[in-house]
């Protein structure tokens, strides 16, 4: 007879309070198949129901530390254990201890480490999850979910070296995962590795398909525009911003930076004003965007209107920016408020 049905019979006995009959059936199955995972787990349930806690733990270890038991089965058992633990409103120490015992063994499959990491994150134990997630991506470099969790933890800590460390192998493992290129570009930008940023963005754009979200493509071109500007390659910067806005005409960051850099060069001011106005409409309390718009109006000679927008910028924390404060002084001076200008030029 199929041993699976024997175990189910034992489970029915156990559910109906026939503990001895259940025990006898489980023992019979285990005598024939000592590594039968269903029988081992049911035997653990028997020990739990009969209050034999030590034997219950031993039986769980027999199952979860058994190399002959498949990772799928172990994951299924651990999921059931987690559900039972939550339903009984117990703390997480027992589950964590169980995972730790399993993790002491050499893992050759990512399923258990991934489940453990997800459990730790559900318990707000982010720091503890990081080494477990690192083990997951070592075992399965194509596990993008685990890699994104590692990136998320590094972003929270503003650890850009860690982001680079996590993203570089991610790109090698899954070259079409554009999110890794994006975070890598941001991290290189923070590290002031400008050539690396341009290289990463260019490589990302090689993997664009018909299904790629246009906003994502726009962001890569926008980053390239920012980098070309820092390198004083203005023609390339403006071309990149143009491309960015082709893919997403509402890319606020690209609109603002493009408009501001045009105003600094005192060129295409009508185009700059049009772009900047879109950012102010989208985020009317953003001091950076208000300042850009005010400065474009200033460069066009619309001093009274410029003052309205620079005042708004100052009301929205603009006084924390030296650039905005200096612009404020310049605009006040050109509206005839010399005293106000001197106050801001200090």
Give the positions of each predicted feature:
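Leucine-rich solenoid repeat scaffolds
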Residues: 338-345
């Amino acid at each position: 007879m199929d041993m699976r049905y024997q175990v189910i019979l034992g489970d029915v006995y156990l559910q109906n309070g026939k503990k001895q009959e259940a025990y006898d059936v489980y023992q019979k199955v285990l005598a024939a198949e000592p590594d039968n995972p269903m029988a081992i787990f049911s035997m653990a349930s028997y020990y739990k129901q009969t209050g034999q806690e030590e034997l219950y733990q031993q039986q769980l270890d027999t199952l979860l530390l058994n190399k002959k038991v498949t990772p799928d089965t172990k994951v299924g058992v651990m999921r059931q254990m987690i559900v039972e633990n939550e339903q009984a409103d117990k703390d997480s120490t027992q589950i964590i201890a169980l995972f730790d015992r399993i993790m002491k063994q050499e893992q050759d499959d990512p399923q258990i480490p991934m489940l453990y990491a997800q459990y730790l994150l559900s318990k707000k134990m982010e720091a503890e999850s990081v080494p477990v997630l690192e083990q997951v991506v070592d075992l399965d470099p194509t596990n993008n979910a685990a890699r994104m969790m590692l990136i998320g933890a590094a972003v929270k800590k503003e650890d850009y070296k860690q982001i680079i460390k996590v993203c570089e192998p991610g790109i090698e493992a899954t070259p079409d995962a554009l999110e890794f290129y994006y975070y890598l570009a941001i991290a290189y930008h923070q590290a002031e590795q400008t050539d690396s940023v341009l290289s990463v963005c260019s490589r990302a754009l090689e993997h664009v398909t018909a299904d790629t979200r246009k906003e994502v493509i726009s962001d890569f071109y926008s980053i390239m525009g920012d980098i070309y500007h820092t390198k004083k390659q203005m023609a390339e910067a403006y071309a990149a911003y143009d491309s960015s806005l082709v893919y997403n005409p509402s890319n606020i960051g690209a609109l603002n930076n493009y408009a501001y850099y045009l105003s600094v060069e005192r060129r295409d001011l009508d185009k700059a004003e049009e772009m900047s106005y879109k950012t102010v409409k989208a985020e009317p309390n953003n001091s950076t965007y208000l300042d850009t718009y005010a400065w474009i109006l200033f460069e066009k000679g619309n001093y009274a209107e410029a003052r309205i927008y620079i005042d708004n910028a100052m009301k929205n924390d603009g006084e924390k920016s030296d650039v905005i404060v200096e612009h404020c002084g310049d605009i006040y001076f050109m509206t005839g408020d010399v005293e106000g200008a001197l106050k801001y030029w200090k």
